[in-house]
């Protein structure tokens, strides 16, 4: 027999981020007690698919007319709690969790840059990022000029009217070159 618990309306935000401090938000933001079991901790949902009430409900979800989960590669309840918690901790309106840093970088670039966009990047970056800039992004019409991260003026010279992103890593991979971030930021602005 399942225990009785307090009613918690579907979709209710149990923690108002404005009322709590960082530690409390880190533990509880974005979640609510399980309405069936009363469990406090967020479970790890290992499902890939979800049940729909009817075809109208499914259509509304797929047409983005209603919030909800349709397939775990896109969203799931466990990841939704993580996203809501990060947004609360950062004071943001939302967050997007990705499967890797590479996925996050790709998502940010293709979301913010259009075809014909240009990137000026340090030549000393993670190999996966270099491959994305050199091989993948050109297929989207996005080009990259690689420059020496130790030379801020190289960044300035490489900027064109189509430049939309200046990219680098504070400690470049693999040589651990240190960028002059204040100067490069000044150039980028």
Task: Describe every region a protein language model picked out.
Residues 38, 86, 104, 119, ...:
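Buried hydrophobic positions in well-ordered alpha/beta secondary-structure cores of metabolic enzymes
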